[in-house]
C-alpha cells in the first residue's frame, strides 16, 4: 500500500528523448516540472552530466533523481581515483539497474536514460524497478507517445549527430503541443567521446 501511494503522489509528467548514431548520442528533454496539474517550475534542467562524455535524462521524483545523480557522479569519480581509468557507460548503467532492482519493494520513482560515448556510442533506458535496455532511440515520460512517433518516422542509423539533434528537438516540440505536462522549452545535448555541446530552444509565441 505504501508503495502504491508513493507512485500516485509522485506521478509527474515530462518528455525525454535519446538517440544514438554512429558519431555520438543525443539526449534531450523539456524544461517543465509538474506535480499533478500544477506547474511546479518552468525552467528545470533534466539533462545532466556524470562526466563530459556521459549524460543522463531524468523523469520522476525530484528527490529520488537528485540522490541517484549524485550517486552516479560519486561512482564515476571514485572509479577514477581508485582504478585510474573511467568506468564504462555499460558498467555504470548496470550498477544503477542493480540498485533499482534491489530497491523495487520501496522503489526510487525514476525513469532514466544514460547515454554517452566511450569505446562506442551507448544509450540505455532504465525504469524504477531496474529493467534496463540498450536502445538506438527511445523516449520517456508523459509525452513519449507523441515524441516516439516523430522519431520512428524519421530515424536512420546513418544520421549525422546534427540531424539526430534536430530530430530530438522536433520530437519534444511535438509533445509540447499535445501533452499538458511537457512544456516551456527544450534542452538538446550532443555527446561525443570528447565532451558535449548543448543548446536550448523555446517555442515562438504567436502574436
From Swiss-Prot:
GO molecular function terms listed in the Swiss-Prot or TrEMBL record: threonine-type endopeptidase activity
The enzyme's E.C. designation: 3.4.25.1
Coiled-coil spans in chain: none
Keyword Nucleotide-binding (UniProt): no
Regulation: The formation of the proteasomal ATPase PAN-20S proteasome complex, via the docking of the C-termini of PAN into the intersubunit pockets in the alpha-rings, triggers opening of the gate for substrate entry. Interconversion between the open-gate and close-gate conformations leads to a dynamic regulation of the 20S proteasome proteolysis activity.
One Gene Ontology term, aspect cellular component: cytoplasm
Keywords: Autocatalytic cleavage, Cytoplasm, Hydrolase, Protease, Proteasome, Threonine protease, Zymogen
Job of this protein: Component of the proteasome core, a large protease complex with broad specificity involved in protein degradation.
Subunit composition and interactions: The 20S proteasome core is composed of 14 alpha and 14 beta subunits that assemble into four stacked heptameric rings, resulting in a barrel-shaped structure. The two inner rings, each composed of seven catalytic beta subunits, are sandwiched by two outer rings, each composed of seven alpha subunits. The catalytic chamber with the active sites is on the inside of the barrel. Has a gated structure, the ends of the cylinder being occluded by the N-termini of the alpha-subunits. Is capped at one or both ends by the proteasome regulatory ATPase, PAN.
Family: Belongs to the peptidase T1B family.
Protein name according to UniProt: Proteasome subunit beta 2
Amino acid at each position: 500500500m505504501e508503495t502504491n501511494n508513493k507512485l500516485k503522489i509522485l506521478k509527474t509528467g515530462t518528455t525525454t528523448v535519446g538517440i544514438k548514431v554512429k558519431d555520438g548520442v543525443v539526449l534531450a528533454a523539456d524544461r517543465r516540472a509538474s506535480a499533478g496539474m500544477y506547474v511546479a517550475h518552468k525552467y528545470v534542467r533534466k539533462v545532466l552530466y556524470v562526466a563530459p562524455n556521459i549524460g543522463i535524462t531524468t523523469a520522476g521524483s525530484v528527490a529520488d533523481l537528485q540522490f541517484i545523480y549524485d550517486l552516479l557522479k560519486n561512482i564515476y569519480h571514485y572509479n577514477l581515483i581508485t582504478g585510474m581509468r573511467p568506468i564504462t557507460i555499460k558498467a555504470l548503467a548496470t550498477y544503477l539497474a542493480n540498485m533499482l532492482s534491489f530497491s523495487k519493494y520501496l522503489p526510487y520513482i525514476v525513469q532514466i536514460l544514460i547515454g554517452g560515448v566511450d569505446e562506442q556510442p551507448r544509450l540505455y533506458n532504465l525504469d524504477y524497478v531496474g529493467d534496463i535496455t540498450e536502445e538506438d532511440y527511445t523516449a520517456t515520460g508523459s509525452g513519449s507517445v507523441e515524441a516516439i512517433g516523430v522519431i520512428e518516422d524519421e530515424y536512420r542509423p546513418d544520421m549525422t549527430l546534427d540531424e539526430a539533434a534536430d530530430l530530438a528537438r522536433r520530437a519534444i516540440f511535438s509533445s509540447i503541443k499535445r501533452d499538458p505536462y511537457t512544456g516551456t522549452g527544450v534542452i538538446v545535448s550532443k555527446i561525443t567521446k570528447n565532451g558535449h555541446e548543448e543548446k536550448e530552444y523555446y517555442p515562438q509565441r504567436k502574436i
